[in-house]
Each structure stands twice: as C-alpha cells, then as structure tokens.
C-alpha cells in the first residue's frame, strides 16, 4: 500500500509541475497561443486522473507477478506521457 501511495503522490507532483510550467508559458511568455496552452493544461489534468485511477486498480490482485508487470507498464506509460506533454510545453514557447 505504501508503494501505491508513493506512486500516486509522484503522479500528482509531476502533474502539478507540468501544469505550472504550461500556466507559466501561457501567462508570462509573449507570443504563446493561449488556446494551445489551455489544451496542454487540460491534457495534464486528464493524465493525472487517468494514471491515479490506473494505480488504484491493478489487474490480477492475487497474482503478484501480474501486479508487478502491471505497475511496470504503468510507470513506462506514465514516463511516455510525461515526455510527450513536456515536448508540447516546449513547443508552446517557440
């Protein structure tokens, strides 16, 4: 349970950082399209909800191997999504 709680906390921290970065780009950088920034911020919030929901309900709770594989895939998917959103935020300021 502790590891799941830590994972959910990490997801929230990363989502908060990404949201703050997108908000900063929207408010303080000249020439940033506000609508695109809003889309990125909505994507961050959706990502946070999706991954916390996935962390709450692993597949095959009785089989430890399946649970471990599930969380490994969850972490890999999370990292992929974080990288994609970070790239979008980077493109906002161009």
Task: Locate the predicted segments by residue.
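Short, solvent-exposed segments of well-ordered alpha helices
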Residues: 1-13, 35-38, 65, 69-72, ...
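N-terminal acidic leader/helix
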Residues: 5-30
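Amphipathic, well-ordered alpha-helical segments in soluble domains
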Residues: 14-21, 47-50, 81
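Amphipathic alpha-helical interaction modules
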Residues: 25-57
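Low-complexity intrinsically disordered segments
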Residues: 42, 50-94
């Amino acid at each position: 349970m502790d590891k799941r709680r830590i994972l959910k906390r990490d997801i929230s921290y990363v989502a908060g950082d990404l949201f703050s970065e997108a908000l900063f780009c929207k408010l303080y950088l000249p020439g940033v399209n506000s609508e695109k920034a809003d889309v990125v911020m909505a994507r961050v919030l959706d990502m946070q909800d999706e991954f916390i929901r996935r962390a709450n309900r692993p597949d095959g709770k009785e089989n430890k191997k399946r649970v471990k594989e599930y969380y490994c895939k969850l972490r890999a998917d999370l990292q992929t999504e974080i990288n994609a959103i970070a790239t979008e935020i980077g493109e906002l300021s161009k």
